[in-house]
């Protein structure tokens, strides 16, 4: 191809203008940020390059981000600053600082920072419980989810759905074990069960396995499309990521195309219940059709309904499923804990199948789950916070527009808060040697679900799902390593913190 053809010249000039724009914008941005930072007392942190900040240092280190956080915490203390391109992150990794920010100064630290353009599209301009800025939209959405969608009364209405999903999970595990000399994949089976429950709760109908798989694959595509990209931190580079943006928009279109038929189906069922007598009398979606949003005259649009339903499904699936995988891994590693849990189950229900009403009578199960959430919180970082107005924390300035991140292992692994924090030990809770309020209100020692005004609204549902699923799995099967293997507890960050090598376990039926 002739380099000096019209199309080549066009591409050439586009590249030149992009580079010039980058250089000029970088100089302006750097000078403005430098002037601004001189006026503020930000927490300490590693020195960075102009414009890119610490972005290249993090990328070139070759280390997992959580390992970098641990090293920076050791060097700079419990509160430090990291500059990632145009984003400034202030990381908290100390219980007292987190309590001050999210409880004592909770209203100031209750909002969310700006999103990248891709996330803004998928969230319908922050129209979700988790992403909404602190204000009327967030209040309306959260109040509806807590009071109408996930209240204790509503959760009880889906007991039959949870029982059915547990039974199907056990059947699938038995069939897989029969075909593979007793060896099964833990995460895959747990994820399927949780997703079945959440689909039924969201849309009010039970679906066949093929439909469930179709929706699940679509939801995974959404999570992949939302993975951070370089242009999220350096927007000036966005012209070089047009292909990725187009792919993300295609995923969004597919998301809407997949979910809207279920929204329309549910609307028809509410208008004419006789068309599907197997449908549930209530679903989370029902609460959204006529939802009044403070400050708005209109009810949610179809794209907004798709976004809210997707939040409901994605928010509770991987977090619960990965918790189960970690739990089974810990029970394999500690057969004495597994045996004690099984004995409590037998003592509580005898030969009957364990039901969720039995969970409250099982203190050792509750201790195992609590220790699981301490040792293996769903993520390394809580959902990002931001301040509604300039604030002070730990003697430092917290300006608006920065990302306030909470590094959870800095708290749950703190030897000043826990005895032998590296050890998986349910007895710390069961024997009353230690305790922790997982909501963080009375003090911060572990915050697997966030805390304060932005605490996860699905906290109660998640603990029920994890407790019930773990109890059923231990009641039905004895869990062990496959021959010549050991559980690998190496971590990897995906949407949640997962096992780097997905857990395969050998089961022996008990019942």
From Swiss-Prot:
Chain sites annotated for binding heme: 456
E.C. no: 1.14.-.-
SUPFAM superfamilies named among the record's database cross-references: Cytochrome P450 (SSF48264)
UniProt keywords, alphabetically: Heme, Iron, Metal-binding, Monooxygenase, Oxidoreductase
One protein family per Pfam: p450
TM stretches of this protein: none
One GO MF term attached to the UniProt entry: heme binding
Top-level enzyme category: oxidoreductase
Essential cofactor(s): heme
Domain of life according to the entry: Eukaryota
Similarity comment: Belongs to the cytochrome P450 family.
Full protein name: Cytochrome P450 77A2
Lineage: Eukaryota, Viridiplantae, Streptophyta, Embryophyta, Tracheophyta
Gene transcribed to yield this protein: CYP77A2
